[in-house]
């Protein structure tokens, strides 16, 4: 895929830029490929090409099965390919979801994501996640998990993966004691494989999860305080 993330001296699309600090502009795949559909096609071009070829073969076999030259073997193969084709088509939406993105990340990438949240202190304003998405794209590329610097389309994608990694399991229950208890359980050697793609979370990762959530919660509280001071939100 040709899209690249650059800290710019280049000539990017002006409407998509997000200035994160004075004199610096981050370019994300969103700025190079405004269409999410086009981005998805580029990201999964190999898999989609395979599905396309598979469907063509399936159609040919089905025509043979329906013709006078059809035999039992061809009919069985045609039925099998139809089933596989349906499965592959149903798999396509999964490739665009945050759960799949998270499963692509190794433990180092998860540590990096948590460290970025602690460093940059993002909030509910999705533009505050753009810098994190940029840094993560570079890191994932360096780890050879992605062929180019376009793993996260924009900050909102990065935020969704962060929620899958930490926010969804922990923020369901706001009782901080339960978080400590869970971290203690993990430190005793427990491992957990859940539907968010978190496998064998070590105590070190659990500690970063706790820190990142605390930073994120404080940033969110400050965001709402600044936006609606009359609400009197307190941390």
UniProtKB/Swiss-Prot annotation:
The keyword Cell membrane applies. InterPro entries: DUP/COS. Residues 66-72 are extracellular. It comes from the Eukaryota. Changing residue 234 to I: In strain: CLIB 413 haplotype Ha1. Disruption phenotype: Cells lacking all 10 proteins of the DUP240 multigene family show no obvious alterations in mating, sporulation and cell growth. GO terms for cellular component: plasma membrane. Residues 1-44, 94-235 are cytoplasmic. It is a multi-pass membrane protein. The keyword Transmembrane applies. The chain crosses the membrane at residues 45-65, 73-93. Its main location: membrane. Keywords: Cell membrane, Membrane, Transmembrane, Transmembrane helix. Pfam families: DUP. It is found in: Cell membrane. Interacts according to large scale protein interaction studies with BZZ1, SRB4 and SUA7. Belongs to the DUP/COS family. This is DUP240 protein DFP4. It comes from Saccharomyces cerevisiae (strain ATCC 204508 / S288c) (Baker's yeast).
């Amino acid at each position: 895929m040709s899209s690249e993330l650059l800290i710019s001296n280049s000539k990017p699309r002006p409407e998509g830029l997000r200035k994160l600090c004075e004199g610096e502009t981050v370019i994300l795949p969103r700025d190079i490929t405004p269409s999410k559909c086009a981005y998805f096609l580029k990201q999964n071009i190999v898999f989609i090409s395979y599905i396309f070829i598979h469907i063509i073969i399936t159609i040919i076999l089905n025509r043979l099965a329906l013709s006078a030259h059809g035999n039992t073997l061809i009919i069985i193969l045609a039925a099998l390919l139809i089933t596989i084709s349906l499965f592959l088509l149903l798999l396509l939406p999964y490739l665009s979801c945050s759960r799949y993105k998270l499963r692509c990340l190794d433990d180092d990438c998860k540590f990096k994501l948590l460290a970025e949240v602690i460093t940059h202190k993002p909030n509910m304003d999705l533009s505050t996640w753009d810098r994190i998405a940029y840094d993560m794209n570079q890191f994932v590329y360096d780890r050879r998990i992605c062929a180019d610097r376009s793993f996260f389309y924009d900050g909102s994608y990065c935020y969704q993966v962060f929620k899958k990694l930490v926010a969804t399991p922990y923020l369901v229950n706001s009782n901080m004691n339960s978080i400590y208890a869970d971290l203690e359980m993990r430190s005793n050697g427990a491992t957990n494989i859940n539907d968010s793609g978190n496998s064998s979370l070590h105590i070190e990762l659990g500690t970063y999860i706790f820190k990142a959530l605390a930073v994120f919660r404080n940033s969110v509280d400050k965001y709402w305080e600044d936006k609606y001071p009359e609400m009197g939100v307190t941390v």
